[in-house]
Curated annotation (Swiss-Prot):
Pathway: Phospholipid metabolism; phosphatidylethanolamine biosynthesis; phosphatidylethanolamine from CDP-diacylglycerol: step 2/2. Pfam families: PS_Dcarbxylase (PF02666). It is a peripheral membrane protein. It is found in: Cell membrane. This is Phosphatidylserine decarboxylase proenzyme. GO terms for cellular component: plasma membrane. The modification Pyruvic acid (Ser) is found at residue 190. Its cofactor is pyruvate. The keyword Methyltransferase does not apply. Belongs to the phosphatidylserine decarboxylase family. PSD-A subfamily. Its main location: membrane. The record marks 189-190 as: Cleavage (non-hydrolytic). Heterodimer of a large membrane-associated beta subunit and a small pyruvoyl-containing alpha subunit.
Amino acid sequence: MSILDSIQRQIPPIHKEGYPFIGGFALASLILFWLWSPLGWIGTILTVWCALFFRDPVRVTPVREGLVVSPADGRVSMITMALPPAELGLGDRPLPRISVFMSVFNCHVNRSPIAGRVDRIAYRPGLFINAELDKASEDNERNSLVITTPTARIGVVQIAGLIAKRIVCFVREGQAIGAGERFGLIRFGSRLDVYLPVGTKALVSEGQTAIAGETILADLAGDDPSRAYRAN
């Protein structure tokens, strides 16, 4: 393996959603260099940041029935009981909710927390307040999915934030989806909420760093005495 091949293997691929933005920043940088070189260097830094923002690294998802993995890179900002959005159709009583906040420095490709079928997709327009605030779940623009497994229904909500102005969803209703499979992206800072069945215990803590498709948030079969797996 050549040195060039080794370097290429260390650089994560870029998601196609980022191509127009990276190209725009790169073009602006060239123009700024022509006008005044210090501005050009600022543009170059922003171009590199944009490429990092849209990075789409390979993830190794734990494969075991019942495991719920993080749908996003970021920080576990809240673990609470909350009413799910009405459009999810998950009932009118509070459910365990785990929220993962993504800063502008995190990878923003969203991944399915569990294997199943996408039974519902519902978009709701709204505000763009700070996604770290609890009321963002109700007030902000969001896109909600229900993923159904043989034993449970999981709600996943993409929530726009203060900077995020565009939610992208790649999947459609009725589609089968694997755990850790890419299903969407939110541009420039946002949050993902995961609604779990009543009685599900979180295997993460508030403030913990989460990796999309890898960090285990919960185990739906965690009360099974034959379950040998334990998350760290």
